[in-house]
């Protein structure tokens, strides 16, 4: 036998196949893990590989802050159906991914997959493949954002929207920051503003909005006499404070 028990375990984590199937495939492949994977696929045994080709269009957004309150993350993980997106095992996996982002600080999704999952000896990728096999649907970690500083997290609609707000503060009590942060986060969840304030709006975006608003006003005879003041008011309404 020119392979080890670890090779069998790695192949099982990669494909979701049983131990005996993995051992047989490695024996046939003379210890080559990639070739063994292909053998399992050809035999129709690599369940997680097959499921990984299916579209993951549903899922959840999850936001959390570290115990010290100085590191926050918002992450999106997708599944195939809304039913699985509400599954306890799926949600636990999403939370584990978020914790791993906080404590391991991966640069991107690829680095997150390679990292050891928080509180586990498995990598995130191995845990992902295990969940695909157990739950029976394709699962994809789509994206995440990690901030360092005074952060407040908010999740709306059971995971339909996740918001993470970072503040620049000095000696603000935690309860005050959390209360204010939740109010701001709820506004962001409701309005989905694109910019923090007027100074952060690109000139081309502002010009485009002016064109749209002017066209709307000109198409409304009632507003034709108050074009300039009204357009300025409408533009101000489009730029509500945000941090997303």
PLM features: what roles do these ranges have?
Residues 2-244:
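N-terminal assembly/interaction segments in proteins that build large macromolecular machines
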């Amino acid at each position: 036998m020119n392979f080890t028990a670890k090779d069998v375990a790695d192949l099982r984590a990669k494909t979701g196949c049983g131990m005996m199937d993995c051992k047989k495939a490695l024996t046939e492949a003379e210890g080559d893990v990639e070739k063994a994977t292909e053998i399992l696929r050809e035999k129709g045994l690599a369940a997680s590989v097959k499921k990984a080709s299916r579209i993951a269009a549903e899922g959840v957004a999850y936001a959390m802050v570290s115990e010290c309150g100085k590191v926050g993350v918002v992450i999106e993980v997708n599944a195939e159906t809304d039913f699985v997106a509400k599954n306890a095992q799926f949600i636990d996996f999403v939370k584990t991914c978020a914790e791993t982002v906080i404590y391991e600080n991966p640069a991107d999704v690829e680095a997150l997959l390679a990292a050891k999952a928080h509180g586990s000896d498995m990598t995130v990728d191995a845990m992902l493949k295990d969940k695909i096999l157990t739950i029976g649907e394709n699962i994809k970690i789509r994206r995440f954002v990690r901030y360092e500083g005074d952060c407040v997290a908010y999740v709306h609609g059971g995971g339909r929207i996740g918001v993470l707000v970072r503040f620049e503060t000095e000696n603000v009590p935690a309860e005050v920051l959390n209360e204010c942060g939740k109010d701001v986060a709820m506004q962001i969840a409701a309005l989905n503003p694109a910019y923090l304030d007027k100074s952060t709006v690109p000139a081309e975006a502002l010009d485009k909005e002016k064109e749209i608003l002017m066209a709307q006003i000109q198409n409304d005879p009632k507003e034709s006499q108050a074009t300039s003041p009204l357009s300025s008011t409408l533009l101000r309404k489009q730029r509500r404070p945000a941090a997303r």
